[in-house]
């Protein structure tokens, strides 16, 4: 939303992306409050915003950035000035080397992926995570629901059990089940994670709660979000909590 009376659009080159830094600063103040009062880390999702000209500003109000491809991981390293938290549904022999060169954390979508590439990541000192499917998502359209029956996005608790549990070398769990969602949806997601994966939470170092947190919306209850995250941290004090709002 732009206040047109303050912008002379005739002087703006077209096509272009136009960003109102005042609105961005307002949103970042909300993010800062959540980081400060909840103790959770907030990292920037490049799939939602890859405008590298504002990376210096975003870097001052975040704890890093997340990538979903080799190109995004390279952009984080080169323009954000630090290695990326990387997750992609698929890694290949052709791109895994570049991705690892640009990453500090990498999340694997399956146990098979970790068996294939995990040793390479661990040898480089990269923190490895596993995407899990907590069997809950508020997304109503099956096409976009990552937890729909038959989903290949993440590992279910039953799959972990049949494969002998969480493998050595996995330091984090990652779920991504929200989309423009409220704090009450995150609460239900965390309840599902504790119900299905609670036995592993005190064995790992970090829990990435993915994106879809609409925390800068006027109707979003940030007080509830902060209380929810603090309560979860109190139950699992060893865990680093990570959010990836777009």
Feature annotation, model-predicted:
Residues 1-18:
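Generic N-terminal amphipathic, Lys/Arg-enriched alpha-helix
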Residues 2, 26-30, 35-36, 41-49:
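N-terminal glycine-rich anion-binding loops that anchor highly charged ligand groups
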Residues 11-15, 177-181, 213:
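Short coil/turn segments at secondary-structure junctions
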Residues 13, 20, 182-189, 221, ...:
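Residue-level preference for long, well-ordered alpha-helices that form the structural scaffold
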Residues 23:
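Active-site anion-handling motifs in enzyme catalytic cores
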Residues 40-206, 228-235:
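Active-site-proximal beta-alpha core segment in soluble small-molecule metabolic enzymes
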Residues 209:
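Structured binding elements
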Residues 212-246:
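Anionic-ligand-binding alpha/beta catalytic cores of soluble enzymes and soluble regulatory domains
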């Amino acid at each position: 939303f732009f206040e047109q009376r303050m912008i002379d659009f005739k002087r703006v080159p077209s096509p272009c992306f136009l960003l109102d830094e005042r609105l961005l600063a307002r949103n970042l103040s909300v993010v800062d409050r959540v980081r400060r009062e909840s103790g959770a880390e907030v990292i920037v999702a490049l799939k939602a915003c890859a405008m590298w000209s504002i990376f210096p500003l975003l870097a001052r109000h975040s704890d890093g950035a997340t990538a979903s491809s080799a190109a995004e991981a390279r952009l984080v390293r080169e323009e954000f000035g630090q290695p990326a938290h990387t997750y992609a549904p698929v890694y290949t022999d052709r791109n895994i080397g570049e991705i690892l060169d640009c990453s500090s954390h990498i999340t694997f979508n399956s146990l098979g992926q970790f068996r294939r590439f995990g040793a390479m990541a661990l040898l480089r000192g990269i923190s490895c995570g596993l995407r899990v499917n907590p069997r809950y998502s508020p997304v109503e359209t099956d096409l976009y629901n990552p937890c729909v029956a038959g989903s290949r996005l993440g590992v279910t608790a039953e799959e972990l059990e049949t494969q002998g549990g969480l493998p050595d070398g996995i330091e984090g769990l990652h779920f991504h089940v929200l989309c423009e969602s409220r704090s009450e949806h995150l609460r239900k997601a965390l309840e599902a994670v504790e119900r299905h994966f609670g036995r592993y939470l005190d064995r790992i170092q970090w829990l990435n709660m993915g994106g879809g947190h609409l925390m800068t919306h006027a109707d979003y209850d940030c007080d509830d979000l902060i209380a929810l995250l603090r309560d979860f941290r109190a139950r699992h004090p060893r865990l680093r909590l990570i959010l990836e709002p777009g």
